[in-house]
From Swiss-Prot:
Oligomeric form and interacting partners: Homononamer; forms a ring-like structure through which genomic DNA is translocated into the capsid. Interacts with the terminase small subunit; the active complex is composed of dimer of terminase large subunits and a nonamer ring of terminase small subunits.
UniProt xrefs under Pfam families: GP3_package (PF16677)
Function according to Swiss-Prot or TrEMBL: The terminase small subunit binds to the packaging initiation site and regulates the ATPase activity of the terminase large subunit. The terminase lies at a unique vertex of the procapsid and is composed of two subunits, a small terminase subunit involved in viral DNA recognition (packaging 'pac' sequence), and a large terminase subunit possessing endonucleolytic and ATPase activities. Both terminase subunits heterooligomerize and are docked on the portal protein to form the packaging machine.
Protein name: Terminase, small subunit
Amino acid sequence: MAAPKGNRFWEARSSHGRNPKFESPEALWAACCEYFEWVEANPLWEMKAFSYQGEVIQEPIAKMRAMTITGLTLFIDVTLETWRTYRLREDLSEVVTRAEQVIYDQKFSGAAADLLNANIIARDLGLKEQSQVEDVTPDKGDRDKRRSRIKELFNRGTGRDS
């Protein structure tokens, strides 16, 4: 049954739209801390084979679980888009920054201690080794001559003129 035309029932609502998931920075930080505690309390498990007195036994070994922004947003039940919006909100941006720093530090420290795969974490954190190659050829004119000679030989081999 539809509402009668011209009704103004919507004015009787105490608020419009759904209530925000986190109404304060403290509530968001508390939810983030719950995620951090959950990650620490729930490591990943790997089965390792050990040999003792000729008998092979398998034992579960706890492995560090890497914190992620995706894991955090799933845990606190918000989308990545909402998380990015929180980053822009004046009241929540400090909490978002702090949470992202905790996640970065946990990953970096875990990789440095060889508790997490350093290659995967380095890529995730945007870390890379850089080397810079500098041309130290003393006479740049010689380089240009070599280039034009190489181009000439290449073109002769392919049958092109230029």
